[in-house]
C-alpha cells in the first residue's frame, strides 16, 4: 500500500509540474515497512535496569581505582570498559588512572616484558584516550635480518596479530611500522581465518570486516559483549553492568526511534517528497552513531531530523528537480524567509517550510539559554550545502567535469560534515565555549579530513549506481581521472589511499589536544566512523539489506538475556 501511495503521489506531482524530464533515481523502497511504527516500552523495565547499573557501577569503580591491581590488568579492564561503551560512567576515574600510568611508568620498558597482545591492548587504550604512546613499543616484533618484516613466531599468535591489527587503525602519518603491520596482519589474518573456530574466529572475521576503531560504538559494544566472553566475564560487575546497560539503552533507543518516526509521519515526507529515499530508521542510526550515551537522547533525535532534511534535499537536487527549479530552491534557502516560498514550484513549498520550521523550533528551545547563535550557524551550513548541491547539479547539467581540486573543494561542503558538525554544537551547546566555536570556525585538519572521508568514500561506493541511472554524473573518480589522466582503477586506488590518510589525520587530531575538549571531538570522530560503516564496501544507506539491516535488528530487536 505504501508503495502504491508514493507512486500515485509522485505521478500527481509530476502532472502539476508538467511533463518535465527528471533525473529520477528510482531508489529501492524501505525494507522496514511499518515494523517500527508501534514501538512501545515498559518504563518499569528502565527503572529496573537503572538500579542494576547504579549498583554494578560502584563495584566496577572500585576495581578501576584499585592501586594494587597490576598495570596490564588495569589497562585490559579499561579497554573492556571502553569497548563496551561504558567509559562515560567513569570518565574522571579512568583519566586519573591513565594519566598516572602514562607519567609514572616507562611504557617502553614495560612493553619490553609483555607479549604482543598485551602491548597492543596497552597501545590502543592510551591512543583511544588521547595519549600519544609511541609506536616504537612494537619494534621488538620487527625482523631486521630478513624480508619478513615481522618475526615469524607471531604468525602463530592469532590473538596477538588481531590486537596488532586493531592497533594499526590508530596510526597517524609517518608511523611506518604501523603501516607495515597493517598490511602484514591483514594478510595473515585473512589467510588463517578459515582455520579458526569459536570466539577467535568471530573476533577476526568481524575485525577484518569492521575494525573496532572505525565501527559504530553501540554495535561494537554489543558485538564485543558476545564475541569477547572471556574478557567480559573476568569481572562479575563488568558483565552485569554491560548486560543491564545494553538493555537499558535498547529500550531508550526504541522510544527515540518511535518519536522520530512519528515526526516523519507528521511532516508527511512520503507525500511531499515521494521521490526521495524513505530511510528514517536508518537515519536514526546516524543520530545514534554520533551520540551513544543515554544523556544525549535529544541530540540523537535532533541529528536524526537533520539527517532526514539532508537526505530529502540531496535527493531533490540529485534525483528529481530540474536545474531551473534548483536555482529557485537555492535562492529561497539563501533568503531563508517564509515569503520566499511563493517563488517555488508547488511540490517544493512543503519541504522548504519544514526546513524553516524546524529551525524556528530550535530557536525557541535555545533562545532562553542565550544560544540562538548556534541555530544561525546551522542555517548557514544548510545554505552552503544548498549552494554545493547546486554546483554539482550545474556540472551535471552542463556536462562539465571539474578539476579534482575544484571538485574536492565543493565536495567538502556536499559531504554534509559541516551541517552535522553545527548540529552537534547545538546538541552540546551547554558545554560549548567561545574558544570551541573559534576552533570549529577555523576549519581544523580533523574537520577537513572528516569531510574528505565523507565525500570520497561516498563517491567510491556509489559511482557505479549513479552511472547506471544517469548519463552524466560527476564524482571524484571522474574528476581525478580527468585531472591526472589516469584510468578508473588507478583513480580508485589513489582515492582509497586518500581515505586512509584522512583517517591518519583524524587520529592525530585526537591526540594530546588542548584546543578543544574530548567531548566536543567525539561526534566528529563518530561522524567519520558512521561514514566508514555506511560506505566501506558499498552504499549501505541506499541499499541497506545487509549490514544496516543486521545492525538495526541487533540494536532494536535482539535484547541480551538478563543475568
Curated annotation (Swiss-Prot):
GO terms for biological process: diterpenoid biosynthetic process; sesquiterpene biosynthetic process. Gene3D superfamilies: Farnesyl Diphosphate Synthase, Terpene synthase, N-terminal domain. GO terms for molecular function: magnesium ion binding; sesquiterpene synthase activity. Keywords: Lyase, Magnesium, Metal-binding. Highly expressed in leaves. Expressed in roots and flowers. Binds 3 Mg(2+) ions per subunit. It comes from Inula hupehensis. Belongs to the terpene synthase family. InterPro entries: Isoprenoid_synthase_dom_sf (IPR008949), Terpene_cyclase-like_1_C (IPR034741), Terpene_cyclase_plant_C1 (IPR044814), Terpene_synth_N (IPR001906), Terpene_synth_N_sf (IPR036965), Terpene_synthase-like (IPR050148), Terpene_synthase_metal-bd (IPR005630), Terpenoid_cyclase/PrenylTrfase (IPR008930). It comes from the Eukaryota. This is 10-epi-juneol synthase. Pathway: Secondary metabolite biosynthesis; terpenoid biosynthesis. Its cofactor is Mg(2+). The Asp-Asp-Xaa-Xaa-Asp/Glu (DDXXD/E) motif is important for the catalytic activity, presumably through binding to Mg(2+). Mg(2+) 3 binds at residues 458, 462, 466. (2E,6E)-farnesyl diphosphate binds at residues 277, 314, 318, 455, 458. PANTHER family: LYASE, OS04G0344100 PROTEIN-RELATED. Its EC number is 4.2.3.172, 4.2.3.173. It catalyses: (2E,6E)-farnesyl diphosphate + H2O = 10-epi-juneol + diphosphate; (2E,6E)-farnesyl diphosphate + H2O = tau-cadinol + diphosphate. A motif (DDXXD motif) lies at residues 314-318. Pfam families: Terpene_synth, Terpene_synth_C. The keyword Magnesium applies.
